A protein has these predicted regions:
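Short, ordered loop/turn segments at secondary-structure junctions
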Residues: 55-56, 71-73, 142-144, 189-190, ...
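Structured adenosyl-cofactor binding patch, chiefly the S-adenosyl-L-methionine
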Residues: 37, 131, 153-158, 224-269
Length: 269
């Protein structure tokens, strides 16, 4: 009698040893087709374990080490709510870019997230940031989710494609960027300026790659000291039928408004 094949047989030996156990601060799980495939292609990620179903394995780049697993095996590796589409990977954290990379006003549009902690929102914002050509997303080191799990699933691969910077003090970082010549616009419902007008500037020429957009959490908005660090507070014009937008939607609108100025100034779209 022929013994049936073990469908969970490891295809390579590369992942049989882990430098650190799963769940440590320098590693985490991601899932979903786009998130995992983008991580596999990202040289800044170390893939410590890669589990895929037989059908999902067809989408992997040739010679990618992986473990062939049944869907229920992958289910047990992940949180109960994870929709993995046959892909799951334990990966290293992406090393943040240095803060100096976003100070220079010629380096491109910067998006600052002030204590936005919801992983779905952060993931969706990263997706919009990739779509609209953001140079880097700045987050507070202890008040932002790590780039694993739901963040990466919601970002649909964009977490691997947008640079991110972690800082201790958001307000001080904004002031440092302004000192170097950047212009910082904070988004607030009570902002004194319309967003489009704020981005256009007083001479209607825009601020080009030196623009900084600052978003706050839905519950508290931008904190007082961060508000004070901005050049101006701006609002997205809305009817009185709703009080506010989801922060990821507000970020997408804001980034679209900023992106419209790049072709006008001869910058790469």
């Amino acid at each position: 009698m022929t013994k049936p094949p073990n469908r969970n047989t490891r295809k390579r030996t590369d992942y049989t040893r882990r430098s650190k156990p799963a769940g440590t601060s320098d590693s985490g799980w991601i899932w979903g087709r786009h998130a995992v495939l983008a991580a596999v292609e990202n040289s800044r990620r170390e893939i410590r374990a890669l589990h895929v179903t037989r059908n999902a394995a067809r989408d992997l780049p040739a010679d990618t080490p992986h473990t062939m697993s049944e869907p229920d095996v992958i289910d047990r590796l992940l949180p109960p709510s994870a929709v993995h589409q046959g892909f799951a990977a334990e990966v290293s954290a992406i090393k943040p870019d240095p803060v100096n990379s976003v100070i220079d006003p010629t380096h491109g549009l910067v998006l600052v997230l002030d204590q936005i902690t919801d992983p779905h929102n952060v993931g969706a914002i990263l997706r919009s940031a990739a779509a609209f050509g953001v140079r880097a997303v700045v987050m507070q080191d202890r008040k932002a989710p790590p780039l694993f799990g739901t963040v990466c699933k919601s970002a649909v691969g964009a977490a691997e494609r947008v640079a991110h910077v972690r800082v201790t003090n958001i307000a001080d970082t904004i002031l440092e960027m302004r000192k170097a010549g950047r212009f910082a616009i904070g988004l607030a419902g009570e902002g004194e300026s319309d967003l489009a007008a704020a981005i256009a500037g007083p001479d209607n020429q825009g601020y080009g790659p030196g623009l900084v957009l600052v978003m706050g959490s839905e519950e508290k908005g931008i904190r007082p000291r961060v508000r004070e660090a901005c050049d101006v507070l701006a609002r997205i014009p809305m009817t009185d039928k709703v009080e506010s937008l989801n922060v990821s939607n507000a970020a997408a609108i804001s980034l679209y408004e900023a992106a419209k100025w790049r072709p006008a100034r001869g910058e790469a779209p």
